[in-house]
Design a protein with these regions (language model features):
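Conserved small/polar residues in nucleotide/adenosyl-binding loops
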Residues: 147-153
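Membrane-embedded alpha-helical bundles of polytopic integral membrane proteins
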Residues: 2-146
Length: 153
């Protein structure tokens, strides 16, 4: 178990080194893919996903929202549009809840929205940090601070 964790940590460090160093599309695409995976895992953990194998409408709306959010993040530098993506996702999730009322519970909709706000939006700040002035230096504070939090005391 230790060697598996060590090896995966080394591989992830190499990937982080490459993506953080190059930035731009080399950072945006892996973050988008990781965000999609993280969104799916969070929706499963929070019982938003009704089936382990298939996606429900709330998850599809979330996947489209994650993709729209990252497309907006990459192709524009307007933070107002990013906020509009978040609001649009919320409105779409609520519309789905109302349109298919007995099918979904309110807790599932809240879990879908929270999963979007927690994983994809949080991860996008690595890209935003990297793309700002002196971001090539500042972005390294993110994994360093995470390492500090996970080390045993």
């Amino acid at each position: 178990m230790f060697w598996t964790r060590l090896l995966s940590g080394i591989v992830l460090l190499a990937i982080a080194l490459a993506t953080f160093s190059f930035g731009n599309v080399f950072l945006a695409v892996p973050l988008w893919l990781i965000s999609l995976i993280a969104y799916r895992e969070l929706t499963k953990a929070l019982k938003c996903a009704t089936d382990e194998k298939k996606f429900n409408a709330l998850e599809w709306i979330g996947f489209v929202g994650v993709t729209a959010y990252y497309a907006t993040l990459f192709f524009t530098r307007d933070h107002t549009l990013l906020l509009m993506c978040i609001v649009a996702l919320f409105m779409a999730e609520m519309f789905c809840y109302v349109a298919a009322f007995p099918k979904y519970q309110a807790s599932q909709v809240m879990a879908a929205v929270f999963s979007f706000l927690y994983a994809p939006v949080l991860l996008s700040f690595a890209y935003l940090t990297r793309e700002c002035e002196n971001g090539i230096y500042l972005v390294w504070l993110i994994p360093v601070s995470y390492t500090h939090l996970t080390l045993p005391t």
